[in-house]
């Protein structure tokens, strides 16, 4: 009816602190509040995740299931007997090989159920199925690498497309995560950098410094269709209520929408700004802050 697909995300193997309050045996220490990562060497973890994902798939018809895969600190794995035993048994590349092992198992499980795995760009350490979708939040490189490898990718670089970053002088704004992403910066980003100049401009926006086109690898022209979209993210650590959330998202969402739908050669900032200003009263009429 609304042409929206809700994609659930179940974070794995990190950002899982809440799980260990009820299931402390699933982390390496056996105690809550001590680590945010599942124990890779504990077979119960995979039973738990398969049970959770099975229920999620019953609730959500989405073809895509997001498993996270980001920001695993790996500290507890280094001293965990079960993790070390798994490294030896499977001849993994130390603790760095543990996350790819976990992700591969979950990827295969989802595929066996006819679903497609989505993950943040750390999953590029894996051999990925051809349909697996990579969300590139640490700059644009993850999406470029994924596309050039033949995988699908979504551009969502935190330095540009995070709505929880400041959109103006921080001294004039409600408290935000950090950074600086005004609407003009968002609008200047090119989601499909299929030539050195576009890739270098993006990198200059991300780094806030000049970048030589010769120093940046673009997406191969025959892989440009592997970038399937852009995503603006709103993390809520510093967002206190719905009004503040709307303030952080709008009108920047208008710029992100145009990035998603309009080719680079048809985008022009001054023209967009005129059209954006005409939309602001419409947003206000709908009660948006």
Q: Residues of each region from the PLM?
A:
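Flexible, acidic glycine-rich loops studded with aromatic residues
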Residues: 117-122, 127-132, 136-289
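Substrate-binding cleft of carbohydrate-active enzyme catalytic domains
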Residues: 1-117
């Amino acid at each position: 009816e609304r042409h929206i697909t809700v994609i659930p995300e179940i974070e794995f193997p990190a950002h899982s602190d809440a799980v260990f309050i009820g299931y402390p045996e699933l982390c390496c220490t056996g105690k809550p509040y001590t680590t945010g990562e599942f124990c890779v060497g504990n077979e119960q973890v995979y039973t738990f995740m398969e049970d959770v994902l099975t229920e999620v798939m019953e609730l959500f018809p989405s073809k895509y299931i997001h498993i996270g895969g980001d920001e695993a600190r790996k500290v507890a794995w280094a001293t965990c007997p079960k993790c070390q035993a798994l490294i030896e048994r499977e001849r993994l590349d130390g603790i760095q090989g543990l996350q790819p092992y976990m992700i591969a198992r979950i990827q295969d499980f989802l595929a066996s159920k006819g679903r497609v795995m989505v993950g943040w760009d750390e999953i590029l350490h894996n051999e990925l199925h051809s349909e697996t979708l990579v969300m590139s939040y640490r700059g644009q490189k993850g999406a470029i690498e994924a596309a050039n490898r033949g995988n699908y990718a979504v551009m969502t670089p935190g330095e540009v497309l995070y709505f929880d970053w400041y959109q103006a002088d921080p001294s004039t704004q409600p408290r935000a995560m950090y950074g600086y992403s005004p609407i003009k910066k968002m609008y200047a980003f090119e989601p499909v950098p299929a030539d050195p100049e576009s890739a270098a401009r993006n990198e200059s926006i991300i780094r806030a410094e000049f970048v030589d086109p010769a120093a940046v690898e673009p997406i191969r022209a025959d892989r440009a269709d592997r970038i399937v979209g852009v995503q603006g993210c709103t993390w809520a650590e510093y967002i206190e209520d719905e009004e503040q959330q709307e303030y952080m998202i709008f009108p920047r969402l208008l710029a992100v929408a145009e990035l998603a739908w309009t080719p680079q050669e048809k985008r022009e900032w001054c023209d967009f700004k005129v059209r954006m200003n005409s939309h602001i009263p419409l947003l206000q009429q709908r009660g948006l802050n």
